[in-house]
Amino acid sequence: MLCVMMLLFSAIASFPVSAQAKDQDAGILIIYSTLDGKESSQVKMLDLLAGHFTSHVTVKKDSDVEASDFKGKDHVIYYGQTKRKLSQKLLSLISGVKKPVVAIGYNAGQISQFSGLSLARKENVFQVHSRSEKADVSLESGLNVLSVSGLKGTALYTFKADEGTTHSFIWKTKKGNVYIGLTNLLNDNLIVAKQLREAFGEKAGTTLLYLRLEDISPMSDEKLLLQAGTYLHKRHIPFILAVIPVYLNPETGDKVYLSNQPKMVKVLKKLQSMGGSIIVHGYTHAYRYSETGEGFEFWDAKADQPITSGNAEDPPSILEKEQDFPNEQAYHSYLEPFREKEETYTKQKLTRAIEDLTSSGLYPLAFEAPHYTMSEYGYQIASQYFTSIFGQVQLSSTTWKTSGAPPFVTAPSMLHGMTLYPETIGFVDTSKQNPLGEMEEHISQMIDFEGGVAGGFYHPYLGMKYLPELVDQMERIPDSEWLDLKKTKQTVKTDKVEIHTSGDGTIQVKNGVSPIYEFFDHHRQTPLEKALWILSAVVLLFVIMFVSYTFYLRATLKKRIFKERRSLG
């Protein structure tokens, strides 16, 4: 997946735009053609890529594009995932674009900038030839490509068909327009992406490194956590602490709050002062009664659908499919009450996570969705609380099983203003014969690519067995630097808390959460328990009144006796 994303990036990089810095004033318009008119996972991947170059990305389906969509847009990308006859209106609008256009997949031959383009065949290839490097590049998993012919300009990449003939699949016209012969943007080939970028003259910048200490909950071993954080500190490495404020017992539903674990809080505060940056990794990292660290929290994994109820006692409502409704409007009307429940649930979780951590002296600077799963509406809600998010992104509105990330820091339209720090090298997987094997492969790929983000995570419960080697592997990436989140500009806020960093390494905090509010928030009761507490309060009140009345009678009696004695004396 990373490879195709970088391949696309390389093509887009033919424009005079820095690969490492966004032009905030420039905009990118993505026009897509899909079978059902919806933003597919591939379209969202393209959005993630484009968001690296600008935070002003507009994504429109072909039939909805208007002339106003082109205003303020320096670049236009057309993506044809399916074959379709494009409207004359759309073709006229694209033909009027003065700067180079990128076209991907089908239908590009209808666009004037690619007049004469012919797509002869679709093949799965395992070796391609880079014209710029004059070298063959092997593809481990293969790549589905469209054979290109009929264009004037330069073939950037070619492949050999089974019969031995050579065909091109990526082309640059004489006027600088770029065609990429791919339809599936989720394929995986990093080597091709690196070669393609070089073919377009992209100069690599500094590779950004980051390492998250993952799944830190109130039940984590604080000694192992301190050991890992101290090691990174001694190596002068800033690190990320992905914290879950509440542990949920899957058998009883009981909660263990971080604030009730003083040893863990002390360790986290110490690590925060030693270069660690806290991020919210969910509130419980669980949905219903799944175990903390295993549950999804912001996606119903069992039903594979968005959250429909925040109450663990309620049976899940299985959402109907859009095809079961007469039109799109009827479907959206049906979804509205469920979206309201999802909004309430998500806001409560994020608010409590931020406020619980802040009240313990731990100041979260970003967000990481548990298991990287969340609906796009969930991302929109999260953007009201955070300016940055870590990890990968769920690319489907119907299943959690499709996720991905670009090789760069990005601010796509689907994240509604949040900046994504992508996870690209994975984690230490002890279920494998070589737990570090896949990470080492991904690190090698990032070395070849140059100038991206090499981000991964490590579970502190593994102890120190793999951490030194992992850090050594990451630091072998040349021209790289570690991300210090405190030295970036971040904002995290709720109605009662505001956390800001201005980029100088300091954190400014405004905390309006009272200890009393926090106590009652942590001791929410069932209706029966509330009734018992009310009854207890009433009984206590009567006891207090009885005791007070008893003291009153005794005091009155003493006064009477005193007066009687004085009168007799």
Curated annotation (Swiss-Prot):
Keywords: Cell membrane, Membrane, Signal, Transmembrane, Transmembrane helix. It is found in: Cell membrane. One of its GO terms (cellular component) is plasma membrane. Residues 22-530 are extracellular. The chain crosses the membrane at residues 531-551. Residues 552-569 are cytoplasmic. Residues 1-21 form the signal peptide. The keyword rRNA-binding does not apply. It is a single-pass type I membrane protein. InterPro entries: DUF2334. This is Uncharacterized protein YdaL.
